[in-house]
């Protein structure tokens, strides 16, 4: 069963700022290019609209069973504190507290994961 989307309002994001955030906060563990390698975390290419835990990566049961279909709203809340949003996730990232940083990163992820 799909997890309902959170009821949040997301500011407009800037993908160029999001690219910088991805490089500094995410690229140590993730790639986002088509055919990119799996690092400590999964390649994020094409993850928008996909069920959490659905790609070629050894996801935790928590991710596989979360019922999340990745969208802007799910990401916006998830990125505040991944371990709180999906208890039991392998994601070790502490999160992004600033709304604008999350909006910028989401704009970049959405753009880069579909190129």
Swiss-Prot record:
Q: Which UniProt keywords apply?
A: Electron transport, Heme, Iron, Metal-binding, Mitochondrion, Respiratory chain, Transport
Superkingdom field: Eukaryota
InterPro entries recorded: Cyt_c-like_dom (IPR009056), Cyt_c-like_dom_sf (IPR036909), Cyt_c_1A/1B (IPR002327)
The known PTMs are summarized as: Binds 1 heme c group covalently per subunit.
| Signal peptide interval | none
* Any one GO cellular component localisation term in the record: mitochondrial intermembrane space
Molecular-function annotations in GO: electron transfer activity; heme binding; metal ion binding
Locations listed in the record? Mitochondrion intermembrane space
User: Which positions in this protein are listed as binding heme c?
Assistant: 26, 29-30, 91
Keyword Metal-binding (UniProt): yes
This molecule's function is given as: Electron carrier protein. The oxidized form of the cytochrome c heme group can accept an electron from the heme group of the cytochrome c1 subunit of cytochrome reductase. Cytochrome c then transfers this electron to the cytochrome oxidase complex, the final protein carrier in the mitochondrial electron-transport chain.
Question: Which family is it part of?
Answer: Belongs to the cytochrome c family.
Protein's name according to its UniProt entry: Cytochrome c
């Amino acid at each position: 069963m799909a997890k309902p989307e959170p009821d949040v309002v997301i500011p407009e994001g800037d993908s160029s700022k999001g690219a910088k955030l991805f490089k500094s906060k995410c690229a140590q563990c993730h790639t986002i290019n088509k055919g990119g390698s799996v690092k400590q975390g999964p390649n994020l290419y094409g993850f928008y609209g996909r069920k959490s835990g659905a790609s070629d990566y050894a996801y935790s049961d928590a991710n596989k069973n979360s019922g999340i279909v990745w969208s802007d709203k799910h990401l916006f809340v998830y990125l505040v504190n991944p371990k709180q949003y999906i208890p039991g996730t392998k994601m070790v990232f502490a999160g992004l507290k600033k709304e604008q940083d999350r909006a910028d990163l989401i704009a970049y992820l959405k753009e880069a994961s579909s190129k």
